[in-house]
Amino acid sequence: MADIGIVGENEYVEKGQEAKLIKRLGFSKCRLSLAIPKDEEYKGAEWFEGKTIATSYPAILRSFLEERGVKADIHVISGSVEIAPGIGLADAIFDIVSSGSTLVSNQLREVEVVLPCEALLIANNNLSKEKLEILDELLFRFEAIQVAEGKKYVLLNAPKEKLDEIIEVLPGMKSPTITPLANDEWVSVQSVIAEKHFWETVSYTHLRAHETEADL
């Protein structure tokens, strides 16, 4: 048995969660959904009453149906679940959906999202002290990458007289780093900002510096 592993949440939930969930990793996001023929009218989970549903995830599907009080036949198949309605094996499917293009190509439409999924870091419940220390180090590295995701490192030179204005829009993760330059009237500013605000922030700081230069 492995000490640690990265698995899809769909597999982790379906197989009974024997390993310990350590961390959600935030990538390979998808969902386990119910889909029916695109021309069928759908008003709720009762549509599945008495129907046959093809899936590779019977445990998760069974739990969902029981919660909704729906009785349906579960037809377990491995792979190519999406073709089951088209060849008469099932009335609907319960499968992994990402973009939804596979459903469209098989004349199906998504009607119920049962379980949003992503990659999970899991571990054996009986790790030794030494292995737990290694796991902690690995977690530190994973978390560093996750924190850095969607961030930009910005390095710019700015006039001292505009520094307070620039810091207002360039705060950094805690505080920007300010370094003196050979020209006493200017400083170097280093910061980390959200990528989605990168251009508006850079444009603002550039404008402030440009206005100052024009006044010199």
Stretches found by the model and what they are:
Residues 2-12, 94-101, 160:
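Beta->alpha turn/N-cap motifs
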Residues 74-85:
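Short helix-initiation/N-cap motifs at beta->coil->alpha
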Residues 20-71, 126-128, 139-140:
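A conserved helix-loop-strand patch within extracytoplasmic ligand-binding domains
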Residues 13-24, 101-116:
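Ligand-binding "clamshell"
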Residues 28-34, 116-121, 152:
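Small-molecule pocket liners
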Residues 146-159:
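Short glycine-/aliphatic-rich beta-strand segments at the starts of folded cytosolic domains
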Residues 205, 209-212:
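Conserved small/polar residues in nucleotide/adenosyl-binding loops
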Residues 158-176:
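Short amphipathic alpha-helix segments
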